[in-house]
Amino acid sequence: MKVRANEHIPVALERTIELLAPALSVSSPYLIDATIGLGGHTEALLEKFPALHVIGIDRDKSALEKATTRLARFGSRATVVHALYDHLSQVANNQGVSEVHGILFDLGVSSMQLDQSNRGFAYSLEAPLDMRMDQSTGVSAGEVINSYSHEELTRIIREYGEEKFASRIAARIIDARKAGPVTSTTALAQIVKESIPAATRRTGGNPAKRTFQAFRIYVNNEIEVLDRAIPTALELLAINGRMVVLSYHSLEDRIVKRAFTEVSSTDVPHGLPVEPKPARYQLLTRSSEGASAHEMEVNPRAQSVRIRAIERRAA
């Protein structure tokens, strides 16, 4: 049965468990769920591995409340912490944990965030232009949209949305502001629609998707945070520990690919008569994997997922 796009079904759950299983089959494994969200992946992992302890991190306080309730039956085996995932080493240390056997990142916007009309993540719902994962800090998308210059808006939309009509969209935003602030998601979506040629609008899904992605990424500093988090997470893995990352757009996937490639390669140039030192990490996915055809059919959010995994080897 096909589910609604905003219904919470963990993406790539079976593949995630399969990739993490060898690392979690030790006597007392620890895993960090760096983006615990509503706790779907963590719940399944705690059920599958009775000795597992999970430290779950999220910047979204609303999600943490729901995850805490969902995971209450596991008692002390599940610890939920409000933090950014580039702080996961500090979070682990605060819990008395120096290394972990598994780490999971499920990046992007959760189904709950899309479903909450006051968050501003969904271009199909009337809502204030917020887009902050943590609404207690930082500037909202509305503040950015209504105060930044044409050049700044163009850069954000082009760099984080990979939108070729970035300059046209920024110009129309500036023009719309003359009549008053752009305050709602539907107003922004309409501005984007009017900025893109009709022929282009007829292909590739909703034309506002890339612009909304751009402002969400910028407001939450997602790329910079992820760029810091992945190397930190790799160092936190125990020998034979494994990390799985689920990403949903090319900007995220490129960061993960680059970090994984760097640590899984030797530093000796090819062709030199030198015995290379073995790499400290081994790729478990040669390239990024997608969801199965069946999962994409029943869970719309899985359609864009890219899965990468890596294992720490003996030094």
Task: Show where each model-derived region lies.
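S-adenosyl-L-methionine-dependent methyltransferase catalytic core, i.e., the SAM/SAH-binding region
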Residues: 1-315
